Amino acid sequence: MSKNRVLNNKKGVTLIYVLLVLVVMSLLSTAIFTLFVSNVRQIEIQEDSVKAHFIAVSGVEVAFAALMQDNKSLLNDHFNVALNATVTPLTDVVTLDNGEADITISSYVDDGLRFVRITSLGRLTGSTTTRELKMTFRVEFPEVQTWE
């Protein structure tokens, strides 16, 4: 008889339902918060990647401008040489507001034509993110460029 009385007594059922709802809501809140934090981190990584990319672009553009200034004197004196001549690569580091670009200007011969390749490695200050860009053009026609 006492067994039936215990089963029919529903005084504590509401408390169990409330606790169950609180546990479920806590789990959902934790999952949403974890997803939010993960998305914020991903956005920061992508933002750093874009910034490093544009630092690398700036490095290529600075190097190209240096080759083109003074009536292309650096380009003609250093890179416009015989096809069998060895050209020593030029290197420099350009410091920008939010990072650095390691620049290498090298030359190679392909199908009897001399090409110049500007390689720029963009590094963002305060981050390990780096991006590398390359621009290639023929010595005779620097206006026609190929980006890699």
Q: How would you describe each model-predicted region?
A:
Residues 9, 96, 124:
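Acidic surface patches and DE-rich sequence motifs
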Residues 1-11:
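N-terminal leader/signal peptides at the extreme start of proteins
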Residues 23, 122-126:
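Surface-exposed loop/turn motifs at beta-strand-loop junctions within extracellular Ig-like
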Residues 50-117:
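Low-complexity, Gly/Pro-rich coil/beta segments used as flexible assembly/activation regions
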Residues 119-121, 136:
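Residues within well-ordered beta-strands of beta-sheet-rich folds
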Residues 13-55:
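Aliphatic-rich helix starts adjacent to a transmembrane/signal segment
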Residues 126-148:
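Low-complexity, S/T/G/P-rich flexible repeat/linker segments used as non-globular hinges
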